Amino acid sequence: MDYQTFEKVNKFINVKAYIFFLTQELKQQYKLSLKELLILAYFYYKNEHSISLKEIIGDILYKQSDVVKNIKSLSKKGFINKSRNEADERRIFVSVTPIQRKKIACVINELDKIIKGFNKERDYIKYQWAPKYSKEFFILFMNIMYSKDFLKYRFNLTFLDLSILYVISSRKNEILNLKDLFESIRFMYPQIVRSVNRLNNKGMLIKERSLADERIVLIKINKIQYNTIKSIFTDTSKILKPRKFFF
């Protein structure tokens, strides 16, 4: 497999892991979800008083129901205001007052500090892709979400599926077991088992019991499966390039 293709997929996996662990850190600091923080960052960096709901949905690229749900939550928490256009009640606008803007700025400034501390503590500062502040983080986050959607709709694969295929293909001459995957992938054991079963049913890997000990599940791939994985990685690597969003 082409080295650059393999490295791009590896970077994608590392970035997704970074976002997962930073999100866990943020949950301890805020009573806000990552999607709520994204909307606050949207208003902070757009620096506009009032924006239509339609424009927000188009910029953030989330499902309308998700955006509406999080805007409603932020409105209840006093971060933003939601109103209908007097001339056309079907049009919804979201606005922030000067006081709310200061409140949002405090959240974003604190988020910048958390990201900086997290990178230093987890030694992420050595990676060029690691975001230095919230704007870079949300650009990274939205790119990852775009890539995950690509995997889902193009190949019917989850991020965990891709991670397992990466580990197996990087050690294609070995016969691995579930423990090997658990030690290599930052997911819970039951999740890995379900993903392996799904990939086995799709014919993308071979799962079998060890003859020496039937409690041990062995995992391997053949040449045809390796070529299929190679093709998936090649297509995935082509869309793993930074995209411009609303920032």
Swiss-Prot record:
**What GO cellular component entries does it have?**
cytoplasm
An individual GO BP term: response to stress
Q: Predominant location of this chain?
A: cytoplasm
The record's GO molecular-function terms, alphabetically, read: DNA binding; DNA-binding transcription factor activity
Q: Name one Pfam family in it.
A: Staph_reg_Sar_Rot
Q: Which domain of life is it from?
A: Bacteria
Q: Which UniProt keywords apply?
A: Activator, Cytoplasm, DNA-binding, Repeat, Transcription, Transcription regulation, Virulence
UniProt subcellular location: Cytoplasm
InterPro entries documented for this protein: MarR/SlyA-like, SarA/Rot_dom, Transc_reg_Sar_Rot_HTH, WH-like_DNA-bd_sf, WH_DNA-bd_sf
Q: Does the keyword Nucleus apply?
A: no
Instruction: Reply yes or no: does the keyword Secreted apply.
Output: no
Q: Which residues bind DNA?
A: 53-76, 178-201
Biological function: Positive regulator of RNAII and RNAIII in a cell density-dependent manner. It can contribute to the expression of virulence genes controlled by agr. May also regulate target genes via an agr-independent pathway.
The record's similarity note reads: Belongs to the SarA family.
> Under which name does UniProt file this protein?
HTH-type transcriptional regulator SarU
What's the source species for this entry?
Staphylococcus aureus (strain COL)
Q: What is the lineage of its organism?
A: Bacteria, Bacillati, Bacillota, Bacilli, Bacillales
